[in-house]
Amino acid sequence: MVCIPCIVIPLLLWVYKRFLEPFLYPIISPIINTFWTKKAVQETAASDQKVSEKSNGTCKPESNGEATANGSTIAADKKTD
């Protein structure tokens, strides 16, 4: 048997999202925006290229000056038993 709050709370949330929020949100949103403003994110212009490559998800593997012939460098990182 399912407890009463497990049925009532999702039902009340659905009623709020479906019927009450479209009327209440335009009234409440200007009030909330007055004290909860979003700050603009500023990117520094003097950032290092390596930092920017890592921050945007395109981190390139760093080379130590030696070329690998046909092997993969990932295999060296795996744990061997």
Curated annotation (Swiss-Prot):
Pfam entry (one): DUF4512
Note the SS bond partners: none
Region ranges (Disordered): 45-81
Q: Where is the composition biased (Polar residues)?
A: 45-58
Q: Which InterPro entries match?
A: UPF0729_C18orf32-like (IPR026776)
Task: Name the family the entry cites.
Answer: Belongs to the UPF0729 family.
Designated name of the protein:
UPF0729 protein C18orf32 homolog
